[in-house]
Amino acid sequence: MSDRQAALDMALKQIEKQFGKGSIMKLGEQAERRISTISSGSLALDVALGVGGYPRGRVIEIYGPESSGKTTVSLHAIAEVQRQGGQAAFIDAEHAMDPVYAQKLGVNIDELLLSQPDTGEQGLEIAEALVRSGAVDIIVIDSVAALVPKAEIEGDMGDSHVGLQARLMSQALRKLSGAINKSKTIAIFINQIREKVGVMFGNPETTPGGRALKFYSTVRLEVRRAEQLKQGNDIVGNKTKVKVVKNKVAPPFRVAEVDIMYGEGISREGEILDMASELDIVQKSGAWYSYNEERLGQGRENSKQFLKENTDLREEIAFFVREHHGIGENSGVEDTEDSTRQD
């Protein structure tokens, strides 16, 4: 062994002794690790994410216009974590959490940790404490725009506080990103949309809270309503598009189309029916849908209702859809990048 190699080995041993095992390794060793994921609660979104769900130990940003379904998407993830026996927390900075609606989406409100902070600093400190405990599987912050700095709350109306919130988010994410990665917590930040003044060319839309969240996010999802869903003359929900704008663990720019039904959330039957029809697992002839020569119903809404009443058949079709896309129940791909990387 050369003197250079011996010196390097000694340095590596010293680093591991001081900072712990795994604090430094060769990239090839890192690549052998697989990404652990938790389902988003939507089959279409799991497929669009490319790894079968939200990657653990990462920052996720979900943004979009008002009433587009951002909180609904997040609550489905919480319900899925709880279904698997995990612990979830919700930082309600907007003070708008509806426990009745959350319960309808499958959230166990008796077990959900809820905080309604007075200031942005308080909300982020609570989030940090929960993440560092290592006992929380998912934490949702709703929303970044509502994380108002203490100086702004205590100041007078009309006072200028330029860049305060951006600095707050930048500092918080610098502290949080490493802890999130080590604890394997999924941190979902819900964000709103603002319009930049005076933009003549390009997209005038931006998200509040500065650039830090864009950099630290492993996945960024844009949620937008596409069209209204009607049953007869009644509007019963919205067809919603969820676009994966950024993805560090799989190819980005995939789009998931889901039905968000009023009072019910994401329609599992609707997304399974659409995806199975595209793959010809479910056959469509005129208005009729059929599976293995068994008719599911005439029209999309009737077929959805049939699958809702026949859960075994629904899950059988879902299994074939998952199998085709290669995501399985416990999917994962090779993890080749550090979540704290900002490029």
Curated annotation (Swiss-Prot):
The keyword Magnesium does not apply. GO terms for biological process: DNA recombination; DNA repair; SOS response. It comes from Bacillus mycoides (strain KBAB4). GO terms for molecular function: ATP binding; ATP hydrolysis activity; ATP-dependent DNA damage sensor activity; damaged DNA binding; single-stranded DNA binding. This is Protein RecA. Pfam families: RecA (PF00154), RecA_C (PF21096). InterPro entries: AAA+_ATPase, DNA_recomb/repair_RecA, DNA_recomb/repair_RecA_CS, P-loop_NTPase, RecA-like_C, RecA-like_N, RecA_ATP-bd, RecA_C_sf. It is found in: Cytoplasm. Disulfide bonds: none annotated. Keywords: ATP-binding, Cytoplasm, DNA damage, DNA recombination, DNA repair, DNA-binding, Nucleotide-binding, SOS response. ATP binds at G64, P65, E66, S67, S68, G69, K70, T71. It comes from the Bacteria. Belongs to the RecA family. Its main location: cytoplasm. GO terms for cellular component: cytosol. Can catalyze the hydrolysis of ATP in the presence of single-stranded DNA, the ATP-dependent uptake of single-stranded DNA by duplex DNA, and the ATP-dependent hybridization of homologous single-stranded DNAs. It interacts with LexA causing its activation and leading to its autocatalytic cleavage. The keyword Transit peptide does not apply.
